Design a protein with these regions (language model features):
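Class II aminoacyl-tRNA synthetase catalytic cores and aaRS-like
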Residues: 1-304
Length: 304
């Protein structure tokens, strides 16, 4: 009976050095999407990603095992195809990848055609903007949004461990924030105010969370923020997520210590929990990234 595993489970078991558990895996079942598919006429190789881990797992399909007809069918599976795969789990310590799956059966769960726009090459951000529904399948966006997920968890974990109360502040508000340009929420009839008064998309939860600070002492809000500055540059964000802590009975030194502790905690958390994503960013986006982050961790803020 095949044992269902995710790619993350396999790599984490390998990374933890748990050879006994890996050796115990013989027959395995995987589900995922084709990243690449190539063959030499008798043996083929599929890079499969199941969405649980940044790295792919290699599938090896053999004409002698599958038969001519099945081999030919599998060899035509395109990038983006969804597969259910069963096979033998094999450790390959001498190869580039630590393990692979020798396919014994493979089912096509979802097909794509020749027009599928993502191929084995780097695509520009401008091109990917035209196919936004497929961007999460690219390495860059996959890494970015996995990182955002992990970093959000780190932020909450840091403040919760410090005893802070998480406050949900409203997105729709009648309060302006520090003179920032704000988006107005209206109906089709602009003279008929939706709430009978001026209503805005929040530029900050600060005003709301300050009142909670005077009841709970240490609080924070972490959520979407909107700014309507007239800028269409690539570096301008009209919507982003912002952390806003408020602490009572504190001075500037307390504020700075909180910021420093939060920054270092989040960096450590990301480096530990997004190792492959951070390697990708360091190799293909900013080759100084890991050096700079480690510099922050290892250098006092007074001289960093």
């Amino acid at each position: 009976m095949e044992e269902f595993k995710t790619v993350r489970e396999l790599f984490e078991t390998f990374n933890y050095g748990d050879r006994i558990n890996l050796d115990s895996i013989t027959e395995i079942e995987l589900e995922g999407w084709v990243k690449t598919n190539r063959n030499n006429g008798s043996i083929g190789f599929i890079e499969l990603n199941d969405g649980t881990y940044f790295k792919n797992i290699q599938l090896v399909y053999d004409k002698n095992i599958l038969g001519d007809e099945e081999f030919d069918k599998v060899s035509h599976y395109l990038t983006g195809s969804a597969l259910d795969v069963k096979g033998k789990f094999i450790l390959t310590p001498e190869s580039k990848q630590p393990f692979e799956v020798q396919v014994t059966s493979i089912e096509l769960e979802g097909d794509v055609d020749e027009s599928y726009p993502l191929q084995k090459k780097r695509h520009s951000f401008e091109y990917l903007r035209e196919i936004q529904h497929l961007r999460p399948r690219t390495n860059t966006f996959n890494a970015v949004f996995r990182l955002r997920s992990v970093l959000s968890m780190a932020i909450h974990e840091f403040f919760q461990n410090q005893g802070f109360v998480y406050v949900h502040t409203p997105v729709l508000t009648g309060i302006t924030c520090e003179g920032d340009d704000m988006f107005h929420v209206t109906t089709k009839d602009k003279d008929d105010a939706y709430f009978g008064r001026k209503t805005l998309l929040s530029g900050s939860g600060q005003i709301h969370v300050e009142s909670f600070c005077l009841a709970f002492r240490d609080v924070y809000t972490f959520g979407p923020t909107f700014r309507s500055e007239k800028s269409n540059t690539r570096t301008h964000a009209s919507e982003f997520w912002m952390i806003e802590p408020e602490i009572a009975f504190a001075d500037l030194d307390d504020d700075m210590s909180l910021i420093e502790d939060c920054v270092t905690y989040c960096i450590k958390y990301v480096l530990e929990n997004c190792e492959e994503e951070m390697k990708f960013f360091n190799n293909f986006v900013d080759k100084t990234l890991l050096d700079r982050l480690n510099h922050v961790l290892n250098t006092p803020f007074t001289i960093a």
